[in-house]
């Protein structure tokens, strides 16, 4: 894999170490991402995999801090076995459907370990979320399966393990 580090930073432009747009069947595997505003950003992509990567940021200003893995308008994404730390959100999904997020370790994020909105028919299982503002935030979603995730040592005024807002037709089992 590659080592990608020190992307540009801005409060107006979302710079990323790796930007993937309008793509199919991309695999990001065994890479190291350090000190990027956004480490991996997918837009309008399908059937992509992010697996066995090590991702962290040392950016401390919230205005320019980005997400480790950021997916927007994507389908059939597989995000697995990544070690993620010290980003705004560890994994962020918006308008992402039919995807699997599993066996990731996410810690030390300024907001959420996993944050997804308007994303349906997704499965997240066996992830470990620790020392984040909140473990996972699920908003405006349906048909989500959440199995055997661990949420521990969250901090701050909104320190939830699992924050849910408007979730329908979903299964939540075996989480602790």
Residue ranges and their predicted role:
Residues 15-18, 22-23, 28, 40, ...:
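Parallel beta-helix/beta-solenoid
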Residues 11-19, 34-38, 42, 62-72, ...:
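Extracellular beta-strand/beta-solenoid scaffold signature
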Residues 1-13, 29:
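Right-handed parallel beta-helix/beta-spiral solenoid domain characteristic of secreted/periplasmic
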Residues 79, 83-98, 129-153, 158, ...:
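A broadly tuned preference for mixed-charge, low-complexity surface segments
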Residues 6, 35, 57:
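Short beta->alpha connector loops of Rossmann-like oxidoreductase domains
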């Amino acid at each position: 894999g590659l080592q990608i580090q020190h992307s540009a930073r801005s409060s107006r432009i979302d710079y990323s170490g790796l930007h993937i747009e309008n793509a199919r069947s991309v695999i990001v595997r065994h890479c190291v991402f350090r000190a990027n505003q956004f480490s991996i950003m997918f837009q309008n992509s399908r059937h992509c995999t992010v697996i066995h990567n090590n991702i962290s940021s040392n950016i401390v200003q919230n205005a320019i801090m980005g997400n480790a893995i950021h997916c927007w308008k994507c389908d059939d994404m597989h995000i697995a076995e990544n070690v993620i730390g010290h980003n705004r959100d560890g994994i962020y999904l918006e308008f992402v459907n039919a995807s699997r997020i599993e066996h990731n370790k996410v810690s030390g994020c300024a907001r959420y370990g996993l944050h997804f909105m308007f994303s349906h028919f997704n499965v997240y299982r066996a992830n470990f979320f620790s020392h984040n503002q909140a473990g996972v935030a699920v908003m405006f979603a349906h048909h989500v399966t959440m199995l055997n995730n661990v949420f521990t040592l969250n901090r701050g005024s909104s320190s939830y393990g699992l924050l849910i807002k408007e979730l329908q037709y979903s299964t939540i089992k075996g989480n602790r």
